[in-house]
A protein has these predicted regions:
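ATP-dependent carboxylate/acyl-activation modules
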Residues: 11, 217-220, 343, 351, ...
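Short acidic-hydrophobic, aromatic-tinged amphipathic segments that line or gate anion-handling sites
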Residues: 319-330
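Active-site beta-alpha connecting loops in nucleotide-dependent enzymes
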Residues: 215-218, 234-316
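Short SAM/SAH-binding signature in class I
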Residues: 60, 84, 191, 338-347, ...
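A short acidic, helix-capping loop that chelates divalent metal ions and anchors anionic groups
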Residues: 92-98, 231, 265-270, 346
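Residue-level signal for inorganic ion chemistry
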Residues: 11, 47, 64, 76, ...
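Phosphate-binding loop of NTP-binding sites
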Residues: 1-125, 129-137, 336, 359-364
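Acidic, Mg2+-coordinating active-site environments of NTP-dependent enzymes
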Residues: 86-229, 281-290, 299-314
Length: 365
């Protein structure tokens, strides 16, 4: 690490780290050659490999630091030794191993503790734990917000659907495209824009890079399946990201009806039942043509039962719900209902492998 001339930007947070890492790397690529974490090689094994993989010709390296247990961030930070950092939304991810979400924020904030004085930390002023993160930063804080016009970078969605950004330091404004699916991506894009502007990126180059961005992996991967649209957002799931995906899907342009295939959110510990029931209630408040609940292993598992309980408590009709025993059964239920013009959102934690539903649906019956 000490031999690398690249300016290293560390990416931390609970929700959207890999997407934000890709965005920051794409935008910094308009300034100079930029390395990035391959996939999500972000733990005690993957992060050192990521550092070792940075070419000495790179001007920047955007590397992700991910933790799941207390005490893990400081060693990662000391390997990474970032020159700057970007923190995404903090939420109850891996809450099974922490006493509270605040404890998660405190752990992740360790990434900010040894930033150089000439570096920066991009933090979301709208995040509940902004004060916690700010208190840990040893570098100047660059605040972003979609609500507070006084932030260093204030963003709002224009009537045409673009992200209208105002840079406080210069007074400059720019209308930038929001990567698909829009909605929650505006916050990730604003953080990436703030980081890139701190490193000298030009507005025009940022607009072009955002317009060219495409999601990676099973992150809002859109494909046509015999006339209906599959939106595979099954890379991972937590209470924050599921609600964001539901909101984005509700606004997604669809000619026909919207269906959901939902699976458990893992590593919620003692909050598992309450969080799944709350998500079930949130689903029940939406306008969907049908909801398939997909278990990790068996329909009787508590997370699926809690989702179903939340749906019932929210008044969701039983005839529009399928509590499937497995992915194949969920696919059969959906196959009988999906028609050309419809759309299906798939969302669950990685361990559920909810893409199995889509794989079954793509097979001819």
């Amino acid at each position: 690490r000490a031999t690398l001339p690249a300016r290293i930007v560390g990416i931390g947070g609970s929700v959207g780290k890999t997407t934000t890492k890709e965005l920051v790397a794409d935008l910094l690529g308009t300034v100079g050659r930029t390395a990035r974490t391959a996939g999500n090689f972000n733990n005690e094994i993957g992060l050192p490999l990521s550092v070792l993989g940075v070419d000495r010709s790179c001007a920047f390296a955007v590397l992700e630091a991910g933790i799941s247990h207390p005490g893990e961030m400081a060693p990662l930070r000391d390997v990474l030794r970032p020159d700057a950092a970007v923190m995404t939304t903090i939420g109850p991810v891996h809450i099974e191993f922490f006493p509270s979400v605040r404890a998660i924020a405190e752990e992740k904030a360790a990434l900010l503790e040894k930033l150089p004085a000439d570096g920066f930390a991009v933090l979301d002023r709208d995040d509940e734990f902004f004060p916690v993160l700010r208190a840990h930063s040893s570098a100047p804080v660059v605040a972003i917000s979609l609500a507070d016009p006084a932030a260093d970078y204030f963003g709002e969605i224009s009537p045409s659907g673009e992200l209208r950004v105002r840079e406080q330091a210069t007074g400059e404004r720019a209308d930038l495209p929001v990567p698909p699916p829009g909605g929650f991506m505006a916050r990730n894009a604003l953080a990436a824009v703030a980081a890139a502007r701190q490193c000298g990126a030009a507005w025009g180059a940022l607009a072009a890079a955002l317009a060219a961005y495409r999601p990676v992996g099973m992150r809002w991967a859109v494909e046509d399946v015999r006339g209906w649209t599959a939106v595979n957002d099954g890379y991972n799931a937590n209470p924050v990201s599921v609600r964001a995906a539901l909101a984005a899907f509700a606004e997604w342009p669809v000619a026909g009806r919207r269906f959901l295939a939902l699976g458990p959110m893992l590593e919620l510990g003692g909050r598992e039942a309450a969080e799944h029931e709350a998500v079930g209630r949130a689903v029940a408040a939406g306008e969907w043509a049908g909801v398939a609940l997909v278990p990790r292993q068996a329909v009787a598992e508590p997370a699926v039962q809690a989702l179903a309980a939340g749906l019932r408590a929210g008044g969701w009709p039983a005839d529009k719900t399928c509590a499937a025993p497995d992915a194949a059964a969920a696919a059969e239920w959906l196959r009988a209902r999906l028609r050309p013009g419809d759309a299906l959102l798939l969302k669950a934690s990685r361990g559920v492998r909810i893409e199995r539903v889509l794989e079954s649906l793509k097979q001819e019956s």
